[in-house]
Every structure is written in C-alpha cells, then in structure tokens.
Amino acid sequence: MTTVGDDAPDFTASLVDGDIEPFRLDDRLGDEPVVLAFFPAAFSNTCTDEMEALRDEFDRGDCTLFGVSTDLPHALAAYRTQYELPFGLVGDPDHRAIEAYDVIEDFEHYGVETVAQRAVFVIDGDGVVTYRWLAEHSGQEPDYDALDEAVDEAADEAAA
C-alpha cells in the first residue's frame, strides 16, 4: 500500500483536460505538488459532491490536481464538461493507477467489478507521497482543510 514517505508509483492512463491525451504521472511531477483525488464513478452523487468541492472549496493555486477514476475517457470528458471542472480527469479503465496505489474498491453490487476507492494523495516535486487519505466508509469525503494544509506544506518544502 502506498503511504506517506513512499516514492509515488508511476502509472500511465488517459488525461481528459479539454482533449483526451496520454497521461504518465512522472511527466507531471515538478515544481509544485500533484494531488491525485481517486473517486469511484463519474456522475454518482458523492463523487460529484467531491469533485464540485474540489472545484469550489479547494485552493488549487499551489498544486496540480487530477481526479482519477476507472471511467472511460469519453465519459469523463462529458462529466468534466457537465460539471465545469477546471482540472484534469484521469481515466484509468485498465486499473493501472488504482492497482499501483492499492485503492481498489469492489463494486459488484452495482454491476461493476472494480472501481477506485475514494482516496487522496499529495505528491511533492521530488515524487514523494507527503499526504494520504483513504475513505473509511461509503459516502465519506476528504477533509478539505487538511488537504489544503498538506498542499501548502508540500509547496513550502519545494520553495525552501
């Protein structure tokens, strides 16, 4: 399981950020922290609440934020447009990201075998995980204040 202090596992997927293009995490690491916000399913209630909170209540100025789900890129493109999400979404239908971060959720009762567990990771410019949050129960959202703090700390370390 990926935890604080670990090197962030690299993975490839598809980025939905206006267009659909290849995504590799290592290519996105650099000067500012990267936040990976894993969520189970586009268009579901709690996931939409979380993505809207990240849009409206989370200060993205000091980081690069990506929402990550196992949804297909074209579904994520429609979702991103409908909810006016100003950050990229990463489509992980091959489960490379959720396996690398060990955030796999069984959703068989919904007719889908595997989705992303709701989780958030902050990765500093050196590629080290500095913050990890995992949902303990269905419908739980991250502590956005704690996430803001974690990003600020990672950004301050990069500036030092």
Where are these regions (language model features)?
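Chalcogenol-based redox active-site neighborhoods
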Residues: M1-A160
